[in-house]
Each structure stands twice: as structure tokens, then as C-alpha cells.
Amino acid sequence: MGSREALLGKALWALTERTLVIAAARWEAERPAGALHTTGTGRHLNAIVSRSPGLRRLLDEEPALTLRLLTDPRGRVQTGIVTFVEALLRRDMVEFGLVPLIEPDALAYALVRLGESFLYADVLAARQPDVATANRLQQALVEGT
């Protein structure tokens, strides 16, 4: 059946996949014409993650394990989110002529790591999670504003 850590990693990825789909759908339902997919979906993703009582409980009870599963660059969760964000960036490049200052794969990775830094700030750096700042910084990286 597998180790507890492997099972928890699979469960976290399954929840993450669902959350990515929900965040994208919520943004698409309200997206104004011409608004980028990346930043709006990212705002919804940050909001959903920051309000997840199950994730907060897991971070409180098993911070080291949870952070390792969520942020390991060789793990499924971070890799999957980066791939998803890169696809959004590439879609914005095609649909809206977005010209990122750095390669889309590097920008996607930076956006995800930035989000992790602010969403999990309480565990990583004894700071309060700050979704609003994460949103502003991510938007600035994507849109240059």
C-alpha cells in the first residue's frame, strides 16, 4: 500500500489538482474581457489555499512533513502547480500577447515559490500568512505593474 508519507503526498496532489481546476473555473466565470488567466486564477488559488482548514490543520500538526510534501521540487505537488501555472502563462502569451521578462517555466516556478512563501509564512518564517501581498507581487511579476 505504501508509506504514510507517500499516501499523504498522493492525497495532497489529488486535492491540489481539484483546487487548480476550481480556481481556474471561478476566475473564468468572472474574468473581464482581456484579463489574464494567470493572475486571476492565481488569486483564486491563493484564496482557496489560505482558507483550507484541512491544510491549516496539517501544517499545524505536522509542519515539516507537510511543507516537504507541498514544496519539494521533486515532489508531485509543487511540480504539478508549476506546470499548471506555466500553461496559464503560455495561454496568456498566445491569447493576449503577454511577453514575460523571463522564460515562462522560470516565471511559473518563481510565482509558485512566492506564493508558498506568503501562504505558508507562519510555518516557514514565523510570520503571518499574507495573501494580499502574495497576490500583488505575483501580479507585478506577470504584468510588470
Over which residues does each language-model region extend?
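Secondary-structure edge/capping motif, primarily at the C-terminal ends of alpha-helices
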Residues: 23-30, 59, 63, 118, ...
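Amphipathic alpha-helical segments that line or abut small-molecule/effector binding pockets
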Residues: 13, 32-53, 105, 109, ...
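Helical hydrophobic small-molecule/effector-binding pocket
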Residues: 36-61, 75-79, 86, 125
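Short acidic/histidine-centered micro-motifs embedded in hydrophobic/aromatic stretches
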Residues: 14, 61-62, 114
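Amphipathic alpha-helical packing segments from all-alpha helical-bundle domains
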Residues: 21, 57, 66-97, 105-112
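C-terminal peripheral helix-coil segments that are non-catalytic and often amphipathic
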Residues: 47, 83-98, 108-145
